[in-house]
Amino acid sequence: MERQRSFSVKSTRVLAFIITIISSAIVFFTFFSSSLLKSNSSLYPTPEANFQIDLSPIAAISDSSVSPQASPILISTHFNSPENTSGSSKISVFEQKISGESLVKEVREIANLTSIKVIELPSNNGEDKKTEKRIEECDVTKGKWVYDSDYPLYTNASCPFIDEGFGCQSNGRLDLNYMNWRWEPQDCHAPRFNATKMLEMIRGKRLVFVGDSINRNQWESMLCLLFQAVKDPKRVYETHNRRITKEKGNYSFRFVDYKCTVEFYVTHFLVREGRARIGKKRRETLRIDAMDRTSSRWKGANILVFNTAHWWSHYKTKSGVNYYQEGDLIHPKLDVSTAFKKALQTWSSWVDKNVDPKKTRVFFRSAAPSHFSGGEWNSGGHCREANMPLNQTFKPSYSSKKSIVEDVLKQMRTPVTLLNVSGLSQYRIDAHPSIYGTKPENRRSRAVQDCSHWCLPGVPDTWNHFLYLHLLHKR
């Protein structure tokens, strides 16, 4: 009896002990789970609490009006027609994707612009996809014009070198949005033009522009860009005390503090214009086998920027009748493309003979387009109505000449960099002087419109930006 009683007491105690352990485990597990959930919520906060996107620059865009000040419009970016035209500008759905390289937020509805789908934010190390491609490996000619309120880099008031023909604002142009467009390459982030760095790169050197009035357009742009970094304006002067006009063609501006000169020499064709006797009369001819008479002044330059194209579309050069001369021979008739190639071969021979590639960088700028509508420059052609860039390229005018230039450059011993500005300039019908190439008091009611040159500040600033990038990354 005594053994059985002792055994039943022990069984009861064991059972009670087991129940106590189970109860304690349940309580502990409940407490631990609650703590774990709280901990996880602190480790992974909601996207709204940690990530913010500033949508203020993104505004609804309709077909009826576009305000560059309101939104950074990307020219040649096309938007699908909105399914909902209520005008709401809120974000309806976010999808968050997190990876080791980047954070991508997909916005499915922003201001009813249903084609804007992805916004890419920088990765954790501060580099994005565009910067992965080195600028020297990037084709900066592929891109689009974007409206940038930080532009222009100078104004008609801050630059004293803009002649009347290019000073559109000074001549009364009121729509000034043409100044605010910046070219943005699609595959890389190009550093902005830095006037101080550019001056340091040409310290003690000669930067020489050679060509027609379109190259003078670019040269004046370069003077204006560089002048913004000069502390004392009196330390910049023209070495022959010449004032920039359309009449006088040769200039040399010295930047005293940098011991450099920025020069321009006018030549419409790079080869020699002259006169020869044809029958009983002396007529204008073009010596396609001889260099321009100013070529001796180009020697010794450290950076040479050439161009020719615009005057090759003139009626004299296009007709080619008793105009092109080689030696004593005046061609009764010569095709303009053949003459253009012969002239470039004369130029290329001069470069190969007179330029030392170890001391001089040579550039050739491609043709810049004209945008005449309704006629040519002397037959009622106009571009006054344009106040925005085109959303598609204008019909190319110099495609055949571009291929000739490329072929000639390939045959040269001296390395020559082609500054290809034709494509990006095609969009900018809005950036020509039009009727604003003269002062209002000198303007006739039926004045010829200038749809070939460019307002300053304007498109030539981008050409010089390309030149800057080549010098910066290929030193």
Curated annotation (Swiss-Prot):
Q: Any idea where this protein resides?
A: Membrane
Here the disulfide bonds are: none
Which Pfam families would you find in this protein's record?
PC-Esterase, PMR5N
Q: Could you name the Gene Ontology cellular component terms for this entry?
A: membrane
**Motif segment (DCXHWCLPGXXDXWN motif):** 450-464
**Which keywords accompany this UniProt record?**
Membrane, Signal-anchor, Transmembrane, Transmembrane helix
Against InterPro entries, the record matches this protein to: TBL, TBL_C, TBL_N
Could you tell me which PANTHER family the record lists for this protein?
PROTEIN TRICHOME BIREFRINGENCE-LIKE 6, PROTEIN TRICHOME BIREFRINGENCE-LIKE 9-RELATED
What does the similarity note say?
A: Belongs to the PC-esterase family. TBL subfamily.
What protein name applies here? Protein trichome birefringence-like 6
Per the UniProt record, the source organism is Arabidopsis thaliana (Mouse-ear cress)
